[in-house]
Design a protein with these regions (language model features):
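Core AdoMet radical
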Residues: 23-28, 41-54, 70-87, 97-122
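N-terminal active-site wall of soluble small-molecule enzyme domains
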Residues: 58-68, 77
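Acidic (Asp/Glu)-rich catalytic clusters
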Residues: 35-39, 70, 92-99, 124-131
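Alpha-helical scaffolding within the catalytic cores
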Residues: 28-35, 87-93
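Auxiliary Fe-S-binding modules of radical SAM enzymes
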Residues: 122-188
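Canonical Radical SAM [4Fe-4S] cluster-binding loop centered on the CxxxCxxC motif
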Residues: 1-31
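Structural preference for beta-strand elements that scaffold enzyme active sites
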Residues: 4-6, 43-45, 73-77, 101-105, ...
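Structural recognition of alpha->loop->beta junctions
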Residues: 38-39, 89-116, 151-181
Length: 188
């Protein structure tokens, strides 16, 4: 069975969501990922807080090290609210990183995140960057966000590499048997 590791790499986040699943855990007591874990991993999902709050070079370094030292890892995904995806010069800023990952999973948390996402999804270079062959991106839309998504989606056509998934706020983060929630020994 393919082993999937949700790797918590940072506490940094621009939100204070009342139902954040990270509040259910003492993050310091999560198991620390080991070399043996990484040697078994098929997929690594970088999570946190929000990995995009790290310096771009830090995030690229983590992805590069996983790719170089663990050839068995077939997929690397980054989970984000999308808040830090939009920056001035977003395409050139994130292009190298997007070439190194299998996709991004975006779960906007507030109206500002949706505005930034709306802007990005109307940028041809951004859409092209997330439409590379083999990429698999997800946009998570929570129950109370469908009206916002329906308004935004009228003006854009997402590449086939994007999947829209309805979500409910989950008070528990229970992983299936082949998935593991772990952390780095030292968080960024």
């Amino acid at each position: 069975m393919e082993q999937i590791y949700h790797l918590y790499i940072t506490h940094k986040c621009g939100h204070n969501c009342p139902l954040c699943c990270n509040r259910l855990y003492d993050i310091d007591k999560l198991p620390v990922i080991t070399v043996e874990d990484l040697k078994q991993a098929h997929t690594v999902c970088l999570t946190g807080g929000d990995p995009f709050y790290l310096l771009r070079e830090e995030l690229i370094s983590i992805v590069d090290r996983l790719r170089i030292h663990y050839k068995n890892i077939q997929r690397i995904y980054i989970y984000t609210s999308g808040k830090k995806l939009w920056i001035e010069g977003a395409y050139s800023h994130w292009h190298e990183l997007m070439q190194a990952v299998s996709g991004i999973n975006v779960a906007p948390k507030d109206y500002g995140d949706w505005n930034r996402l709306d802007y990005l999804l109307q940028q041809p270079k951004w859409l092209e960057m997330t439409a590379q062959p083999g990429m698999s991106n997800r946009l998570y839309v929570f129950d109370d966000q469908w009206d916002t998504w329906n308004t935004i989606s009228k003006d854009i056509t997402l590449p086939a590499t994007w999947q829209i998934i309805g979500r409910k706020w989950d008070k528990e983060f229970k992983t299936p048997e082949n998935e593991h929630f772990v952390r780095l020994p030292l968080l960024y």
